[in-house]
Every structure is written in structure tokens, then in C-alpha cells.
Amino acid sequence: MTTKQTVSLFIWLPESKQKTLFISTKNHTQFELNNIIFDVTLSTELPDKEPNAIITKRTHPVGKMADEMRKYEKDHPKVLFLESSAIHDMMSSREEINALLIKNNIPIPNSFSVKSKEEVIQLLQSKQLILPFIVKPENAQGTFNAHQMKIVLEQEGIDDIHFPCLCQHYINHNNKIVKVFCIGNTLKWQTRTSLPNVHRCGIKSVDFNNQHLEDILSWPEGVIDKQDIIENSANRFGSKILEDPILLNLTSEAEMRDLAYKVRCALGVQLCGIDFIKENEQGNPLVVDVNVFPSYGGKVDFDWFVEKVALCYTEVAKI
């Protein structure tokens, strides 16, 4: 009688991440998939016994968890991390993310990493960058400031930019964004309300936090249409889930799968969230954000998650 292979998966997550990710949790579960026995443990601490893989979300680039993670990787080189410190470091840099997306021909709005006001002026003069454009901090995650953003509407607004940063052409997209959540080749998607169409009306720039988009309601008159304010004043901007993007004719399953596969290959990441929009004029998909180990669109079933992670492990480990 042949003994079935057993694979040990260890999910290492802070309690705060567990609460935001899962509907309910289990400290331990075991199941069979593709003739393999998966033994799964969930904990806020690293394991004493070496598992086959550790699934984790590093909450900050520095600090106790980051130090423990790097040390464990060094001491246990055979353990597969989803995702590793190297991936988390890369995904913390908008400059690195965009460079890899551009290198691999992933469609994104025109984007430039800049370190000074003079660089921005040169980009505008050469028409490589045009108004309006969105300003994103270089750091993509782990801090409050990573979500503090600005839309520059007139050239005078350049004076308010904090450097270094990423300047990206602002694309009007009718207040809809498609979010694709990946666990390897397993995809989950949804449409959410997003930033509204903006207009140049003499205002230099406007600020917002992309995790608290209700700030948009206080923007000066003329920047966005009054109807957008009326329609969204009763809802928190960015938190309203709309119909399936396929039903809204925003995209197709084939397009989402193709885009997700290309982004994952470009960045070397398995657990990620991809945000893309469709520009109003041509309707082409443009990737505007990629993040590591996302929320998966709200709380998910623990058993569903670990089964998809196990499937992802078999894909990565080629077993």
C-alpha cells in the first residue's frame, strides 16, 4: 500500500490580519487534495517545526515581524514562503513594481518615478507627462503615508508634491475599478466604486487617502461633477461593491485571467491583488495598482482559502 505524501502548510499572520481576512478561523485543519494530505496550521507565531511552506503577510517593512521573517528564511532555506521578504520588499516600492510592469509590457498609465520638482517640470514640458496626473508615494505599503495621494490639476500644484514619488497620468474611468484577487491561478474578482472623473477648473491640486475616499466629497466645486457627489454622499467612496465586472461589460473572464497571469509572472508573486480600470475613450485595460496578499474583497471562508493556497503550493512546488 502506497503512503500518501503529506505537506505541511503554516499560515503565519498577525491577529489583526486574521480578523480582517477570515469569517472564522481554525488553529489546525487537515484535508486531501490531488492525492496529497495537507496539514495546515494557523498561528500568530512562527513554527518550531519546519513546515514545507509558510504563508504570510508582512505588515511592516521594519520591526519585529520583518526581522523574525528574514532570520527564519536564512535559517530555513528549504521552506517556501508565500510571500518572501524579497517579494514584500519589492512590492513596497512603487518604482520597482512599475519598472517590472513596463519591462513586461503590462498596460499601465504613463508613470514616472521622480525625485524633484525640476524633473516633473521637464516631463510636462516634453509632454511625456500631462495634466491631470496623480501623485503616489514611493512607499506602497506598511505606513499611513503610503495611502496619501494627490491629483495635480494645474502646473502650480507641483509646489505641493512631496518627493520622491510616482507621477502617473490620471485616467478618467467613470468611477469604476475592477479588482482581481489571485491565489496562484485561482482568481476572485469584483467591481468597486472608485475615483470619479475629474475636471481642470483652476484648482491647483486635491488630496485624498485611498483608504478613506470620503475625503473626495469635500473637494472644491468643479473638480468633480455634482451628480457624482449626490450619488456617493450616502456611501463611503471606494467601499461600494457593484455588479460583477463581466455583467457590467467592463471586462471578460479571459481578459482578467490573461492580465492576472502576466502580472504575476512579471512580479514573481502568487498572492496578490490587481486593480485595473478601463479608460473612457478607448476602453483599454490599465493596471493602476498591485498589492501583495490582499484582503480578497472582504472576509473569506477559511477552508476555501487554505484549499486554494494548497492548490497554489502544488503549482509552485510542481508536485
UniProtKB/Swiss-Prot annotation:
Entry cofactors: Mg(2+)
Cofactor note: Binds 2 magnesium ions per subunit.
Positions that bind Mg(2+) 1: 275, 289
MF annotations from Gene Ontology: ATP binding; inositol-1,3,4-trisphosphate 5-kinase activity; inositol-1,3,4-trisphosphate 6-kinase activity; inositol-3,4,5,6-tetrakisphosphate 1-kinase activity; isomerase activity; magnesium ion binding
Secretion signal, residue range per the UniProt entry: none
GO biological process: inositol trisphosphate metabolic process
Record function comment: Kinase that can phosphorylate various inositol polyphosphate such as Ins(3,4,5,6)P4 or Ins(1,3,4)P3. Phosphorylates Ins(3,4,5,6)P4 at position 1 to form Ins(1,3,4,5,6)P5. This reaction is thought to have regulatory importance, since Ins(3,4,5,6)P4 is an inhibitor of plasma membrane Ca(2+)-activated Cl(-) channels, while Ins(1,3,4,5,6)P5 is not. Also phosphorylates Ins(1,3,4)P3 on O-5 and O-6 to form Ins(1,3,4,6)P4, an essential molecule in the hexakisphosphate (InsP6) pathway.
Binding site for Mg(2+) 2: 289, 291
Positions that bind ADP: 94, 136, 147, 168-171, 194, 210, 288-289
InterPro entries recorded: ATP-grasp, Inositol_tetrakis-P_1-kinase, InsP(3)kin_ATP-grasp, ITPK1_preATP-grasp
Enzyme class: transferase
Listed name of the protein: Inositol-tetrakisphosphate 1-kinase
Enzyme Commission code: 2.7.1.134, 2.7.1.159
PANTHER family: INOSITOL-TETRAKISPHOSPHATE 1-KINASE
Subunit (UniProt): Monomer.
Residues engaged in binding ATP: 94, 136, 147, 168-171, 194, 288-289, 291
Family of the protein in this entry: Belongs to the ITPK1 family.
Catalytic activity: 1D-myo-inositol 3,4,5,6-tetrakisphosphate + ATP = 1D-myo-inositol 1,3,4,5,6-pentakisphosphate + ADP + H(+); 1D-myo-inositol 1,3,4-trisphosphate + ATP = 1D-myo-inositol 1,3,4,5-tetrakisphosphate + ADP + H(+); 1D-myo-inositol 1,3,4-trisphosphate + ATP = 1D-myo-inositol 1,3,4,6-tetrakisphosphate + ADP + H(+)
Positions with a binding annotation for 1D-myo-inositol 1,3,4-trisphosphate: 17, 141-142, 147, 291, 295
Domain ATP-grasp: 98-317
Gene that encodes the chain: ITPK1
Database matches in SUPFAM superfamilies: Glutathione synthetase ATP-binding domain-like
Pfam entry (one): ITPK1_preATP-grasp
